[in-house]
Every structure is written in structure tokens, then in C-alpha cells.
UniProtKB/Swiss-Prot annotation:
Protein name from the UniProt record: Histidine--tRNA ligase
Gene assigned in the entry: hisS
Entry's family note: Belongs to the class-II aminoacyl-tRNA synthetase family.
GO biological process, one term: histidyl-tRNA aminoacylation
Assembly and binders: Homodimer.
Organism: Aquifex aeolicus (strain VF5)
Gene Ontology MF annotations: ATP binding; histidine-tRNA ligase activity
């Protein structure tokens, strides 16, 4: 049997690895500008954490979590998302006692048992940010601005930020009843998953991607019409702040997100070209308290790295690499030359190939290096190196002391 990677678990190589690193570096740079601190989370948590936070009735908990038992029979899970673990850490380490509000970001692999397709894997990578302790809508606007800044910095075009408000608990209760009454009337048009969702969490029907369900809910009551005065004011202020920040957005009253913990603001940065959600997030003002912490308003976002990679072009970026070619027994000198160049911040490839100069230079050309550094006995004797520009063919001798 040839050993292959597990279905849905992928290697990231070459140009894709460069795209991955570009996304990570860009997001980290922008999060640093907003003064977020990094938190490094474990990939394994108690399954109960996600059942209580993400929601028992969600597809993630019902169908997609990788759950297993440890040797003591305790149910553990590979994390399907990062917010729940960050909230758990916020409570466990009493971060709420340190300052009035806390801003954290994380990066790493997540795991969901989904059908693999373009931009969607069973192991995928997310970068996310969370703000704890701020209830005001200007925090929502700033979180969305971070998302917009990341996409702009990556040069991703054709992205729209969709927003909605899910209100508070009282708003949700009134809306749930009205929505359930409506869905009962169109029940025959719904898929089997949505019929079962009606009893558990009817809001999830609005998030269904099946075309017949999309048509069925077009005339459904809108959450926006059930917002209390306070939640409506929060939502209107958010829209004003987004306009002030010149962030293009559109309202999507069917946007509910796939996780049960969201309240008030929810948003998605969507690629219309791919039909994929690239970055998503929202408020979860009750989650900290529901998991055993003090009442703490909170909000955040997560971006899917692999999905963003689909939108980045392949870059033929040639690094200024120095390829050191030793001839004969000159390794002591050649290794020292390579070390000197690296200490000066140069990228150096030391040749391990055997063969004549022609073969070595052909290999250097194949690697796409900028310079070949040729070292033979004559160069050692004169304490020099021969540097060849691989693009122009120009060749010159340089003293070791002048490198």
C-alpha cells in the first residue's frame, strides 16, 4: 500500500506555501496595527465546550466534529473553530480581571468532517480575532474594518461585506415564533435537513444553501423587523460607522451564520466570484456567561486561509539568492563564504551537487537564483570569490574582505 495523505487533509507546497505565508504575515501585521495580542490554543478540547458554545443543533456539532474518547472515557474533539477555545481561555485564565477589555488573535488548523471541495478541507487553517468587554457598535465597525484592511492589503477584489443583526435574546424569541409559523406554511418546500431544523433552531433554515429552501424563505419575516429599540440603534450606528470608514457593504436579512452563539451584529465578507465566504464573524454577548464566566459582551471574526489562497495570483517573485559552488576540496573556505553572506542578510544556497561548472550553472539557472558564487583553489589562494550574475552573464572577482 502506498501511503497517501488522508482525504481532506492536504499538504501545502511551493507557490501555495508562499501564498499561505503571505496571508498569515499580512493578517498578523494588520492585527498588530490594531494592538491585538496573540493567543496560542490547543487543537484538542473537551467536546462539551463546542456542544455548549457552537450549539447542539448546528451542523458542526451534529455532523462535522471529529470526536473521540481518551483512555479515561472522556469525550474530546479536534477544534472545529477558534472562538470557543478563546472564550474558554479567557474564562480559565481570568483575563477579564486584567483590564477593562481584552483583544486577542489566534492562528492554526481547524478540523471539520465535510465533503472536500475547492477551498474547503477537513483540516483547514483559520486566523481569528476576538474582542472581550466592549458592547458599543464602534467595536463592531472596527472588527469589520480589520477584515476589510486584510482583504485590501492582499489585493483581493470583488469582495462584499454583508451585514445583519440577530438582536438580543428577547428579540430572538419573538422572531423565532413568527418564523416558525411561516415555515410551517412552506414546510413541503423545505429539504429534510431544514424540516428537522424547524424544531431545533428555525433560524438555521435561513442559512440553507439548497435552492428550493432559498426560494421558500424569500418571503419569510425578517429579523430586522423584530429588533428592540436598543438593538435597532446599535445596528443603525454600525451602518453609519461603516459609511464613515468607506467600507462597502450590503444588508442581508437572511444572514444568520452557522453557529448558535451569535447575537446582534453578524457579517460575512463574500467573494461573489467564488460563491464562498472568506471571512465571517459577529457578536456573541452571552457566550462568556453561558460558559461560566462573568457577563461579558464580545465579538470577533475568523478568516479561512485556504479560501483566500484561491483568490491570490501565482507570483513569479525571484529572491536574490546566492548559489555557492565549491570546486575541489575547498569546503572550509566555501562554507565560511556562505556564512559571511548569510550574516549580511543574503539568502544562500550551498551546492551539494557534484559535476563540472557547466552542470552546476545549469542547476543554478533551474533554481532561478540571481548569483552564482564560484569558489575553486585559485579563489581560496587569493582570498576571493567569483560572482556570476545569472541574468546578464556578467562575471567578476571580489575580495573576501569586500563581500
Amino acid at each position: 500500500m502506498n501511503i497517501q495523505s488522508v482525504r481532506g487533509f492536504h499538504d501545502i507546497l511551493g507557490k501555495d506555501a508562499k501564498k499561505f505565508r503571505k496571508i498569515s504575515d499580512t493578517a498578523r501585521k494588520i492585527l498588530k496595527l490594531y494592538n491585538f495580542e496573540e493567543i496560542i490554543l490547543p487543537v484538542v478540547e473537551y467536546a462539551e465546550l463546542f456542544q455548549r458554545s457552537v450549539g447542539e443543533t448546528t451542523d458542526i456539532v451534529q455532523k462535522e466534529m471529529f470526536v473521540f474518547e481518551d483512555r479515561k472515557g472522556r469525550k474530546l474533539a479536534l477544534r472545529p473553530e477558534g472562538t470557543a477555545g478563546t472564550v474558554r481561555a479567557f474564562i480559565q485564565h481570568k483575563l477579564y480581571a486584567l483590564r477593562p477589555y481584552v483583544k486577542l488573535f489566534y492562528e492554526g488548523p481547524m478540523f471539520r468532517y465535510e465533503r472536500p471541495q475547492a477551498g474547503r478541507y477537513r483540516q483547514f487553517h483559520q486566523i481569528g480575532a476576538e474582542v472581550f468587554g466592549v458592547a458599543e457598535p464602534h467595536a463592531d465597525a472596527e472588527i469589520i474594518k480589520i477584515v476589510y484592511d486584510i482583504l485590501q492589503a492582499l489585493g483581493i477584489k470583488g469582495v462584499v461585506v454583508e451585514i445583519n443583526s440577530l438582536g438580543c435574546k428577547k428579540d430572538r424569541e419573538a422572531y423565532r415564533e413568527a418564523l416558525l409559523n411561516y415555515l410551517t406554511g412552506v414546510k413541503e418546500e423545505l429539504c429534510s435537513d431544514c424540516i428537522s431544523r424547524m424544531d431545533r433552531n428555525p433560524l438555521r433554515v435561513l442559512d440553507c444553501k439548497v435552492e428550493t429552501c432559498k426560494v421558500a424563505v424569500r418571503e419569510a419575516p425578517k429579523m430586522i423587523d423584530f429588533l428592540c429599540d436598543e438593538c435597532r440603534e446599535h445596528y443603525e450606528k454600525l451602518k453609519n460607522y461603516l459609511k464613515a470608514l468607506d467600507i462597502p457593504f450590503r444588508e442581508n436579512y437572511n444572514l444568520v451564520r452557522g453557529l448558535d452563539y451569535y447575537t446582534r451584529t453578524v457579517f460575512e465578507a463574500v467573494s461573489d466570484e467564488l460563491g464562498l465566504t472568506l471571512i465571517a464573524g459577529g457578536r456573541y454577548d452571552y457566550l462568556v456567561e453561558e460558559l461560566g464566566g462573568p457577563p461579558t459582551p464580545a465579538l470577533g471574526f475568523a478568516l479561512g486561509v485556504e479560501r483566500l489562497m484561491l483568490l491570490l495570483p501565482d507570483e513569479e517573485e525571484k529572491e536574490e539568492v546566492y548559489f555557492v559552488i565549491p570546486f575541489g576540496d575547498v569546503h572550509e573556505y566555501a562554507l565560511r563564504v556562505a556564512d559571511i553572506l548569510r550574516k549580511k542578510g543574503k539568502v544562500v544556497e550551498y551546492s551539494y551537487r557534484k559535476g563540472g561548472l557547466k552542470k552546476q550553472l545549469e542547476f543554478a539557472d533551474k533554481l532561478g537564483v540571481k548569483y552564482a558564487v564560484i569558489i575553486g583553489e585559485d579563489e581560496v589562494k587569493n582570498q576571493e570569490v567569483t560572482i556570476k550574475d545569472m541574468e546578464t552573464g556578467e562575471q567578476r572577482r571580489v575580495k573576501l574582505s569586500e563581500l
